Amino acid sequence: GISKEATIYLLEQGVRVTGTDAWSWDAPFSYTAEKFKKTKDPAIIWEGHRAGMVQGYSHIEKLNNLDKLPSHGFKVSAFPFKIKNGSAGFVRVVAIFK
């Protein structure tokens, strides 16, 4: 997973949207749960996500077909589904080619 520090570093470089084809941006929860049992530190839970409390950004998980994209030369748009009173939700992500 991506740590809070690594996420903040990306944001400091000008990144405003992150995405992954993995289940989560953070470390697998089984790993985090084991680490939490040892440290009792709540800051390690969803630490990559918590970077958004320091500096706002948008994040997309569970992307697919990334292997079909070229290394550059396209734009990405995300079309969210409206969810009443939600703080997160589904988006349809598309790559736009010239």
Features from the language model and the residues they span:
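Active-/binding-site microenvironments in catalytic and ligand-binding cores
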Residues: 1-98
